[in-house]
């Protein structure tokens, strides 16, 4: 049986700066959770189409690693580690 493609990949940005990379099955709810947690961002951008949870998790890890490669080993401001967890 095929896996559901119900997981969205997204980035939170403050202006043009990526401050968080994540995945969710409910973008509207997740955006509100981030705001309620006090994260400062100007936009939430959905990246590509919905994916399987496994595919989205792999994208998340790779996207954070690419960010780190381009920012002297630093994760986006609100990501706690390179896996997005």
Predicted regions located by residue number:
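Structure-specific nucleic-acid interaction/processing domains
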Residues: 2-85
């Amino acid at each position: 049986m095929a896996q559901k493609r119900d997981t969205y990949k997204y980035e939170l940005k403050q202006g043009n700066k990526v401050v968080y990379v994540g995945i969710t099955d409910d973008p509207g709810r997740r955006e509100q959770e981030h705001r309620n947690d006090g994260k400062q961002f100007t936009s939430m951008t959905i990246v590509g189409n919905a994916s399987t949870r496994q595919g989205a998790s792999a994208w998340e890890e790779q996207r954070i690693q690419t960010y780190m490669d381009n920012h002297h080993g630093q994760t986006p401001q609100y990501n706690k580690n390179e896996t997005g967890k």
